[in-house]
């Protein structure tokens, strides 16, 4: 629709509008990871990103972390769930966190995801930087990603297993 109507940006919300996914001028989906990067970088440049840190979950894409590293933006990972993201933000005084799913929390304004607030901040970034959403998102190279649950009988043993740790590190490199 965005591409067909030659719009600059589009927004999609879930049923209660606590999640927001954007669509750029080329019809590309801009998920929560990209939104975190775009908003985090903007707030950091303005000196408004507490600790220059965003809070993400373990499901975030490696490309987000590499892009953050490149610009000096820090990040903390939590378990999946906006509850855990918010707990970390509250504990450490961070103001921006979220999930790939589009749950984005701006703790100065809300304690949970707010899709309308998210879309307003995205619009602020686009207008203030005078750049398209596609250009802003283009700084992040999203890597192929497979999310798969693996059942184990003892999570602690699996996590501490050297072979598992080596495989995870190899995949991250």
Region locations from a protein language model:
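Structural motif
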Residues: 34-50
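Generic structural signal for well-ordered alpha-helical scaffold segments
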Residues: 3, 41-44, 172
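N-terminal small/polar loop signature for handling phosphorylated ligands or for N-terminal nucleophile
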Residues: 1-23
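Short, structured secondary-structure boundary patches
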Residues: 1-4, 32-34, 95-101
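Phosphate-binding and adjacent anionic-ligand microenvironments
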Residues: 9, 46-173
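Anionic group-transfer/hydrolysis microenvironments
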Residues: 14-16, 26, 59, 101
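Short Gly/Thr/Asp-enriched flexible loops that form oxyanion-binding sites at enzyme active sites
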Residues: 18-37
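Short acidic-hydrophobic sequence patches enriched in Asp/Glu that either
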Residues: 31-39, 60, 118
């Amino acid at each position: 629709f965005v591409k067909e109507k030659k719009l600059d940006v589009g927004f999609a919300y879930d049923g209660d509008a606590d999640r927001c996914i954007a669509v750029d001028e080329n019809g590309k989906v801009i998920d929560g990871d990209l939104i975190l990067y775009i908003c985090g970088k903007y707030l950091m440049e303005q000196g408004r990103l507490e600790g220059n840190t965003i809070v993400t979950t373990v499901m975030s894409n490696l490309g987000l972390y590499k892009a953050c590293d490149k610009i000096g933006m820090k990040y903390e990972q939590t378990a999946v769930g906006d509850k855990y993201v918010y707990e970390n933000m509250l504990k450490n005084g961070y103001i921006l966190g979220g999930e790939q799913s589009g749950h984005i929390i701006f703790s100065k304004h809300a304690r949970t995801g707010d899709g309308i607030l998210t879309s307003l901040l995205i619009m602020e970034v686009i207008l203030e930087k005078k750049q398209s959403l596609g250009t802003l998102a283009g700084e992040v190279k999203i890597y192929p990603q497979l999310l798969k649950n693996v059942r184990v009988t003892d999570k602690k043993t699996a996590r501490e297993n050297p072979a598992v740790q080596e495989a995870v590190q190899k995949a991250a490199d």
